[in-house]
């Protein structure tokens, strides 16, 4: 008999075949409950308060000292960790994409899977370990999210570059994001499903969510493999596990012009225009090198697949010493300039002054060297002072020279170094702050004074806000305006629900509902009538000497309507309202930047702009997650908005009540009524009729979004709470709380 004791358990908790295995297409509500207080070691911790007590200059001094404090266990290239830390910060922020606002540096996700194990992030595990003594020293006064980005900024400064500034305020989370769709490929560096006829056009929430742009939706369904590359939305990388593009060229094909197209697509999806893109590449590649000392088969598994003894590190390298001059990261062995630890314009000089020929790295990857042996002996070795090299380039570098749009920009920067320095400083600042939201969230002594259009600026608030008496007066005028409860509620929702918790953009503050592009969105059809009436009320009120913003008035109108609807249902009490919103101007609103906030579907209003391959209930879940809602909040809001008559275009889908405009729990009571039998009324199962089982008479009509609250087991369980005989009071209380939450999602000035 074996001496090894037999374990009484064949499987531990959480193992075995899961519901997801049985029903992979099941609506996954887990994405609404990620990052709960239960995952945090200190649920009541106030990071902004802690950050304000940080000795910021002392931290920067320690970071600067670290740059040249080379460690034997991971020696610094050229004796300076700056380039490594720039890459760390870049790859943290560079996961951001404008399509859904997800990704980015805002919560320190680079510490967790899958990002900590992406092929493009090889060796960044070492970068974060180099930072640990400093993180340990300053503790919770600096988050990992802020520290990663700040270290990249300090790295630039330590090598002679003047940055545009830095702002803190990125609080850490304690578990991986589950809502981000990184692609459908099953192998690292795969790109088979994000391009071509076999492209997966939608993923259920929990595996990530995809909402294809309507303009491209038909192309995505009908194109074949030979068609022009059309990257799946909302992805902003060409292969699984890359930040942007394959540096060897598309699919490893060393074609600089084709690479330029990939660069434009991916950087554009990260909100960078052509000039910003050139500046970022030219500025970033002024420093450091890539690593491809030997074949990739010398590299061990990534951190998430490595053994316990690796203690969270990965990619153990058996080539030579496995570090220093034997490092293998991308497989490319490129050093761009003779001054890899000092800011200069040499990258662009080399790019245009040399003619380039294709070669291969020691690892066998495509890269470029100067023709005729030019430049030999001008570039230092990263670890051996006795060696010299020629400069080298990536295929993606040559794109800046041969792409017809990038080339003139790059030449201008080459001839005007001061323009490159300014453009890189601004683009870098945008890169590392793009997902932080409004300026009210920015912290620290290095916040620039200049407001930038991509920050969605707002005018300063008037410190003299309207009084409680003013609020009561305005409510009375709104309710006497002739506008219905449904119209007022729907308009307030249209304004506030543009908010995205992913990148903290959108929301009611600014009243951009009245500006381009929002005023022309299909989802906002009919709000112009409400806005005109509210503008009249506002003008009359403001003529009396006091001032109310339209942004406040839009929210107040919805709030007054909810109060009236609750009162009509027999419930007393008020709905919270806190003034202080301001009205943005069209000049403060970047139309192109705001276009990505347009709702292609909003299940809360039973709206879809077009027919999509992804199911309506999954689009609803995606929207709810971006609104930071829990499953109970999602449920109660749907039930309340339906009976209030807030549907797009006044549709009766899901209005399961004979007294619309009254805040009752009728939606749930009638949805759960077993005397009603439901059947689809459309071939695509998008709409349904509910008929009396005995008489066959049609009682209700509903959408997929409505019926999922009776079909999905978890949502039905929640619906039963609100649909019970004693659920009315709770329904109203919970609806009011969820309503106020959505109305104030962007009020960072209050938090």
UniProtKB/Swiss-Prot annotation:
**Annotated Basic and acidic residues bias:** 214-227
Share an example GO biological-process annotation for this protein: cellular response to hydrogen peroxide
Q: How is the cofactor bound?
A: Binds 1 heme b (iron(II)-protoporphyrin IX) group per dimer.
Q: Spell out the residue ranges making up region: Disordered.
A: 1-21, 195-227, 365-387
Report what the Swiss-Prot or TrEMBL entry states about this protein's PTMs. Formation of the three residue Trp-Tyr-Met cross-link is important for the catalase, but not the peroxidase activity of the enzyme.
**Domain of life assignment:** Bacteria
Which HAMAP family does this UniProt record tie to the protein? Catal_peroxid
Q: Which PANTHER family match?
A: CATALASE-PEROXIDASE, HYDROPEROXIDASE I, BIFUNCTIONAL CATALASE-PEROXIDASE
Report quaternary structure and partners: Homodimer or homotetramer.
Q: Belongs to which family?
A: Belongs to the peroxidase family. Peroxidase/catalase subfamily.
Protein task: Bifunctional enzyme with both catalase and broad-spectrum peroxidase activity.
Protein name (database record)? Catalase-peroxidase
Which species is listed as the source? Pseudomonas putida (strain ATCC 700007 / DSM 6899 / JCM 31910 / BCRC 17059 / LMG 24140 / F1)
**What does the record give as the organism's lineage?**
Bacteria, Pseudomonadati, Pseudomonadota, Gammaproteobacteria, Pseudomonadales
